[in-house]
């Protein structure tokens, strides 16, 4: 099976260590609710660490290896998965540091007025005065709520960090790639 295009693969976490003796790996997910990672039937691993790839450099196609997922579960805030073909601790340890990617079309459907953070990236942020604040270039969590980073996408320069809460976010229109904010 071939990998989807690079634009369709979403990084969801990284392998932090081996789990047990039977080849399972422990993944440090980027999200506190890693539903897409837990439900995926296959994942792609990249052994190029993010710091070496550079922030503007996507995962290289040649560095990707696809694995079928035999099982996945939550354990102490991490995701533990068993990958087909990884059968012992030494094989699992060799994958330490690998980035975990999943095809975007493999994500479970979300309810109305719910969004995957990845779908917000690239949206234009507009305030109530209809002024463009910039483009959403990143989304993070601070423990209490999501935070969208708005700025210049070409330079990755952040101009605003805006809480993603209903008091601030007035509307999200993914079809038009816009987010209306009560923000100056």
UniProtKB/Swiss-Prot annotation:
GO biological process, one term: rRNA processing
Coiled-coil blocks: none
Principal subcellular localisation of the protein: cytoplasm
Keyword Chaperone carried by entry: yes
GO cellular component terms attached to this protein's record: cytoplasm; ribosome
Stretches assigned to the PRC barrel domain: 112-184
Key words of the record: Chaperone, Cytoplasm, Ribosome biogenesis, rRNA processing
Entry-linked InterPro entries: PRC_barrel-like_sf, PRC_RimM, RimM, RimM_N, RimM_N_sf, Transl_B-barrel_sf
Top-level taxon of the source organism: Bacteria
HAMAP family tied to this protein: Ribosome_mat_RimM
Known role: An accessory protein needed during the final step in the assembly of 30S ribosomal subunit, possibly for assembly of the head region. Essential for efficient processing of 16S rRNA. May be needed both before and after RbfA during the maturation of 16S rRNA. It has affinity for free ribosomal 30S subunits but not for 70S ribosomes.
Family: Belongs to the RimM family.
Protein known as: Ribosome maturation factor RimM
Organism: Polynucleobacter necessarius subsp. necessarius (strain STIR1)
Gene designation per UniProt: rimM
């Amino acid at each position: 099976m071939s990998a989807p295009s690079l634009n369709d693969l979403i990084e969801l976490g990284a392998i932090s260590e081996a789990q047990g003796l039977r080849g399972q790996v422990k993944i440090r997910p980027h999200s506190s609710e890693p539903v897409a990672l837990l439900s995926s039937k296959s994942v792609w691993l990249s052994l190029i660490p993010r710091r070496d790839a550079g922030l503007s450099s996507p995962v290289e196609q040649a560095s990707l290896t696809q694995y079928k997922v035999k099982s996945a579960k939550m354990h102490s805030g991490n995701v533990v998965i068993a990958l087909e073909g990884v059968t012992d601790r030494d094989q699992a340890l060799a994958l330490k540091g690998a980035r975990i990617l999943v095809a975007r079309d493999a994500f479970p459907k979300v309810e109305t007025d719910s969004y995957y953070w990845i779908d917000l990236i690239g949206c234009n942020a507009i305030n109530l005065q209809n002024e463009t604040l910039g483009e959403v270039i990143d989304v993070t969590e601070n423990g209490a709520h999501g935070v969208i980073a708005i700025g210049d996408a070409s330079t990755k320069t952040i101009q605003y960090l805006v809480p993603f809460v209903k008091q601030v976010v007035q509307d999200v229109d993914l079809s038009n790639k816009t987010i209306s904010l009560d923000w100056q």
